[in-house]
Amino acid sequence: IHRVEEAGADLLHLDIMDGHFVPNISFGIPIIESIREITRLKFDTHLMISNPEKYLEPFKKAGADSLTVHLEVCPDPARIIDAIHVLKMECGLVVNPATPVEEIFPYLQLIQLVLVMSVEPGFGGQSFQPGSLEKIRRLRARIDALGLDLPIQVDGGINPDTAPSVRGAGADLLVAGSAVFRAPDPAAAIRTLRG
């Protein structure tokens, strides 16, 4: 964590997986509490979990700065967006590769971040799905047409080869795991990804 913080990372994107919504299990609230003590980086907390509404307040108390939830697990997205805002936190919505990006359009004016998954959620090291580029373009066009200052974040398969086309399609924030954490020089990797 200190290594990527010193390398100039803007935030830490924390993938929380429950073994239900996605097949993998990662870490949870106790780990967030522990790492909150050692860094001031923003915790961009990506909840790949079923029933996220049950865990909003515990994640806030643990030190999460923002909570991003999957559209696919929210029967009433406006309700969970409101619940996150009541906690005085930023809220993001995620759209998976198979979900039409237009399903997120009704909520764009209510959220602070849109996360486009460019791989299937749940496992690292997957290849970028090129079809995500058109989804990013359509999302960028809609956000711009509405006159919103709403960042588009892209997660999955981000590396020096995919980053330029993702940025070119309209993404603002790139989530890079292996490309940064496995790099011999994380600062150089971050600079390369930023373009």
PLM region spans:
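Conserved, mostly hydrophobic/aromatic
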Residues: 4, 15, 59, 114, ...
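Conserved anion-binding
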Residues: 38, 54-55, 64-151
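C-terminal helical cap(s) of enzyme catalytic domains, especially alpha/beta-barrels
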Residues: 84, 167, 179-195
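Glycine-rich, proline-tolerant flexible connector loops at the mouths of alpha/beta enzymes
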Residues: 11-29, 71, 119-127
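A structural motif
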Residues: 6-11, 64, 111, 171
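Catalytic cores of alpha/beta
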Residues: 53-61, 99-111, 156-174
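Active-site beta-loop-alpha junctions enriched in small/polar residues
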Residues: 17-19, 48-52, 72, 96-98, ...
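Structural motif
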Residues: 7, 38, 62, 87, ...
